[in-house]
């Protein structure tokens, strides 16, 4: 992947967001071949052997190094995630073009991924976490805004993007209720480079979601959304 021009070479400015339980190697490959950035979380592979197999499948299909189509892997860098060190070792073995960090300081990942020429994006929910990621040397910030699925944010993209652009000149990605061309154009008008789109891909044939869940997603509306702090979240 050409780090300097990969965004311009995309068919649409979208990262297919990594979703727990849902995203897999098949979805990554299909997304990247369709002209966007496919990604998946390492935690979806319950064993290191399964993660190694997924990496092997993806690199065989999408290529390696500068000849690779754009794709990424998401790793939890929280100290509570016991497997992060082993996951990083496999990342260094297969060298995905983009590594997305979540729920912790990305510094150790940045240093190692930059050694092989990869890009590191960090997902953030506020300016405090944005500054920590910037100080760690990330190449891009994923602004997880109000309306994002999973570990959601509270800020409106109208406020978040403009404030981040004052302190960061790298790649800006925005997530949160983006599911159409109109919403992609809206975040581009704000100054974002890429859309972080997840829910739209749950109902694809490649995803690991059950058929019943896919049907529920297709038929759901805003009234079904529940926001809770009772399961997991982001420390301050």
For the regions a protein language model found, what residue spans apply to each?
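Active-site entrance/lid segments in N-terminal catalytic domains of soluble metabolic enzymes
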Residues: 1-171
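Gly/Ser-rich catalytic serine loop of serine hydrolases
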Residues: 20, 175-180
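Conserved active-site-proximal phosphate/metal-binding subdomains
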Residues: 154-170, 179-236
């Amino acid at each position: 992947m050409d780090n300097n021009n990969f965004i311009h070479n995309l068919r649409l400015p979208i990262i297919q967001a990594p979703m727990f339980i849902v995203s897999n190697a098949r979805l990554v490959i299909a997304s990247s071949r369709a002209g966007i950035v496919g990604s998946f979380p390492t935690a979806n592979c319950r064993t290191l052997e399964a993660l190694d197999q997924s990496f092997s499948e993806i690199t065989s299909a999408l290529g390696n190094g500068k000849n690779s189509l754009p794709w990424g892997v998401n790793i939890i860098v929280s100290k509570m995630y016991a497997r992060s060190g082993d996951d990083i070792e496999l990342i260094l073995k297969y060298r995905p073009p983009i590594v997305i960090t979540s729920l912790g300081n990305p510094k150790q990942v940045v240093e190692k991924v930059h050694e092989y020429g990869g890009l590191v994006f960090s997902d953030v929910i506020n300016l405090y976490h944005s500054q920590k990621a910037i100080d760690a040397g990330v190449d891009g910030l994923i602004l997880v805004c109000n309306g994002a699925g999973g570990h959601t944010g509270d800020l409106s993209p109208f406020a978040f993007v403009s404030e981040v652009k004052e302190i960061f000149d790298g790649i800006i990605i925005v997530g949160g209720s983006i599911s159409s061309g109109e919403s992609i154009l809206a975040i581009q008008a704000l100054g974002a480079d890429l859309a972080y789109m997840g829910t739209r891909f749950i109902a694809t044939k490649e995803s690991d979601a059950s058929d019943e869940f896919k049907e529920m997603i297709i038929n759901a509306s805003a009234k079904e959304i529940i926001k809770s702090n009772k399961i997991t979240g982001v420390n301050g």
